């Protein structure tokens, strides 16, 4: 892969449009896995997605030019899968399985285009919504977030000269490499890049992936970014996300259907996927509620991804549940991925070493950590907590509770209804940084 002088590239914006999204597969792998399931099992469901900036002190509409945002969103809508990308998706093995994507699905995907968007401003924030068929709107989540985050980075660096940019990226590279060196202390580490959605930029994410590949070798197990996996000859990694149980719950007509929504999604998932893709994401409506009501067959799945509780605390609860269900945790897998940086990775690894199989998904603090790297403080280079979540399904409001109330999304009245239904056990407020 050709090396890019990122500082020079950032400074030299002589072209009309520097695309942030270069390909429809510049997205997370689990979006494609989920898309196939949605296409196959939920083809007629409509779902809306909404951009949510949880870092309220940052007014995105004041930092990002609306014209530039529209240009990037419009450009993303022009993209189609290339012949090379189609061949790679059809011919490659993922998670040890050939032809994980059905030919009929790929034929449909070959003509895929991102649907239209709605953009406005309110109270210094952008209101960005995507309405339509779930099998279309779901694919906006990652590119929308990547566009917003990179435009914010570009805006913060607009006034910087070439020398300052050179210093900025030199320091960021040194900071990143020092993290890589610390990870070498963990002999059985398995870690992958989960940093697409809130990355500083595509080029910076690519450099971070190359650094991990070079620095920790086989301990680096792949990237969630499908384009980077293809271009760098890496494994594409990822399982499933909260949107699946959120939509199933929104569609529920009875209390029984609402209670069973997370498990219905797992059954649906297992119709298409197996093995190391059988990873449970338990916290959409609170991990305690999920474990309390879970059928015994859930304990036979490969592992869990505790996503909003503190990693050690969340991992211990799942290990206790496995033991209660008569399963040996040493044969199970925990994937930690919530807001991790190198200290948390090391602490979590050492805490659970020998007790359970572990893997780590390293996200924003891998691909967007520029704190202290600029010669003067530039607040626009600090990452923010911005997400793009399902807001409704077939016109019915969607809710995510999470183990951290700060991460809850949905209409307040609906959130309250879900809390009364699923309970508030083990939900603990934690500051959300990314």
From Swiss-Prot:
Mod. after translation: Transiently phosphorylated on a His residue during the reaction cycle. Phosphorylation strongly increases the affinity for substrates and increases the rate of nicotinate D-ribonucleotide production. Dephosphorylation regenerates the low-affinity form of the enzyme, leading to product release.
Pathway(s) annotated for this protein in UniProt: Cofactor biosynthesis; NAD(+) biosynthesis; nicotinate D-ribonucleotide from nicotinate: step 1/1
Enzyme class label: ligase
Single GO BP term: NAD biosynthetic process via the salvage pathway
SUPFAM superfamilies with a match to the protein in the record: Nicotinate/Quinolinate PRTase C-terminal domain-like, Nicotinate/Quinolinate PRTase N-terminal domain-like
GO CC annotations, alphabetized: cytosol
Reactions catalysed: nicotinate + 5-phospho-alpha-D-ribose 1-diphosphate + ATP + H2O = nicotinate beta-D-ribonucleotide + ADP + phosphate + diphosphate
Gene Ontology molecular function: any one: nicotinate phosphoribosyltransferase activity
Residues with PTM Phosphohistidine: 242
EC number: 6.3.4.21
Keywords annotated in UniProt: Ligase, Phosphoprotein, Pyridine nucleotide biosynthesis
Job of this protein: Catalyzes the synthesis of beta-nicotinate D-ribonucleotide from nicotinate and 5-phospho-D-ribose 1-phosphate at the expense of ATP.
NCBIfam families registered for this protein in UniProt: NAPRTase (TIGR01514), PRK05321.1 (NF003704)
Family listed: Belongs to the NAPRTase family.
Protein's recorded name: Nicotinate phosphoribosyltransferase
